[in-house]
Amino acid sequence: MFGSLLYFSSLQRSVSTPAREDGGAPIRSPFDVFLERNGLPQQPNFNESPIDHSRRLRTLVNAPGFTPQFVTSNPNRADGQFQFHSQPFEFGPTELDGLRMFLAEPAGPVASPAELAAGKIGKCIACHAAPNFADFKLHNTGTTQKEYDAFPSHTGGASFFSLPIPTLATRTANDLPATEQHPTASDRFRSIPSDTTTLTDLGVWNVFANPGMPAPQAKIRTILCDGQVPCPLSDAILLDRAIARFKTPALRDLGHSAPYMHNGQFDTLDEIITFYRDTSDLARAGTLRNGAIELQGIALTAGDNASLVAFLRSLNEDYQ
């Protein structure tokens, strides 16, 4: 977790070689250039959390007197364009509209009917706060449930929501991933659910309290316990919390990382935003198994997709 944080911080401070056309200037996204051009904060202040930094940025870009200076070319290259992306290097009104949606939060934990009708609330910073756009934690956003329920063999009443999953007391070595100690384990909860309704991918459920994987246990326990140290909850309770959770991906340079999600489930950013609109509805209806509570605050309409996609594309950088 902390290694990833250092890695992404190093990317932000990375400098290209002098032989490059940009003359050794820092590699930045259109979003980063937009922040600099408008005197907006690019990093959290001392002792400021990423989410508070993101909220401060939201206040500034929504201020009545804010007059944005847009980005129309790459200041680090003679042709003004990306070197490794085919899209224009720009941050304009559509990207700003998407940024405002990305930073927006509902008035309460759950989006109200009025907020759902109005849209434009992504609540993305709950897990993807700037500047790294990842909280390096574990969440269930519904990818496993969508994958499981999509297979025709699972129709006729079978669903991920009702799938029997072993508890800590009933989980056996055969339920877990294969290790040196248990080389013939079935991996049935770390599998693609295409052949049988007994297969699915439960993410960190396979790792937590797994005696064959001792190294990450302390970090996982802290995340599942929402940062409480020492954790007052039993491993049995935490195992239920671990169902279908996966590590938050960072959002910088997504143009080089398709297909998306841990299982390559989506080919486009538009599909992902539609997915979040759908799973947020499931979360509010109580039909998303072990879903992240943050999903209930998303209030987006179909018309919001394009602006959010434009903003996410503005996070692309010239890394190979």
Predicted regions and their residues:
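Periplasmic c-type cytochrome electron-transfer domains
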Residues: M1-Q320
